[in-house]
């Protein structure tokens, strides 16, 4: 049976999810999760939530799926230890540094690769599995055949989103909220700029070309089960508890009854929340304008539907009762005893409670039926009496308070035993031994014991590199300025001028950030066809199997989202020779990185904001055959839309990052500073490099300092 995974943005939502049929819930506590604006949980609430779920057989997954700075990793280590101590069943991660930290501090807690890791190929999923990921959450953009292929070939469990909001950009690759509004989607603070109006190749007139409808894949659960999907994820940690109850309840029934939704159930899903209806476009491989939709700000609340939903979980309603057997012995001259038993993960579990010696009845004697009636009053608990047996001598009496007290004590004891049983079940042998020895069973190594090795001294001077969008931007004039590296998209290599003199400049082939399993052999063949590209830019975990064994120098691209020193160390261990730091970091944070790898930063150019599966150009003005378009926002700012590998388009920033006049750029311990050319002419490319190297007078018309000084939330 596939697992149904529901969102829990707060305790009310958690109760709603559990009581309407979730097999597992995902939730966050603290600041380090991809929905920081959700209510989330305090430490105490989280511990109570774990107990609440485990008692009812529901698993709890902690979301620590954001990018973290070096300082934040110290706090994250504490969160890891607390989560393990509370009995969390798995942890979702995005950050490469947190991945290595979790393996050292809580090595036996299962890790799940968040969709923020941007995994969408069989090769990438297998790399994640090789790193110890028990589960991989796939990108929402995959179609049914691509999911089927990954399920068939990956040893890790596969989780997919089946209902809820769709981002326009691939998860983990969106920088629009960060660059435009200083609120990072990679750090759980997305401001959702994709829901705002824009114009395409014209002024903004109120259209919403970046706003996708919510996904609804309720009609395809049967084929998901057949292809081997392990977990079905419902999106919605920012949504109300009533919404969680509605969608969880409907999907629970569909799974249990192995059927498609009725017209009424489909209507209820849409009534709970939608944006002009739903879409199944990605799953079916049918992209296009029909996938886009909006939701009015004053959309009415479905009061009747939500009232019905609340009735399913409010006021202590318990839909997931545990059947128990009760056996009471009331004998003359002996203390009364009550045994309660239920099935647990380790077989039958028994708990005993003992009371006083019964008295001789002065008038009416105690009956077995009276005992059954009082002991069966389990309201307010998770238990329900399924079997009852009484051994009762004649002529005895017990006060009602004693009977009720026996019931409370026995059921409370059973509750505690069940919670402990769940925790011990997922404890590893070494943890059980630590517990037996009276030591902390939750943490094998403290943070200090897992200190980073000393990094080499960074270089005193920074060399400049260039990346281009098109081959014609690489000219003799550019190479005459002797850039250390020139990054060229792999599909543009064959268009380079064969007569160029590269001198000591390294030619680095850039693999596409977004690709598919079917592209893996194609990309490898392109690399083999171009041995002159002695280096390869790696921007995704799925690139590693493509480049492995080719003997090329590997350089980490910005798509890896390197945010801390541990991430640099991780990628060094994967064979990289240099790596690009996230451009969300302030210059002080870049400076303070322990440079376990030669480090690069983008210091010029239009920063990439979104990379998309749905072409914003084709959906709005028709295909321009690679020429792209221009996106205009409400303020008149214009964002170029460029076209790349596989006809996937990318939104570039409206303003050009320019730091040539900022000396801090040279004080960060960087080995390389990258000049990122997108819309520049070949002449401008050479002029910009001269400006950065020799202090020329070239400046862009509309410039920004990026996040180098501002940083992000």
Region spans (language model):
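Long, basic N-terminal domains or extensions that often function
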Residues: 134
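Conserved nucleotide-cofactor-binding alpha/beta core module
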Residues: 122-123
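Active-site pocket-lining/capping segments in soluble small-molecule metabolic enzymes
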Residues: 1-119, 137-138, 146-231, 238-713
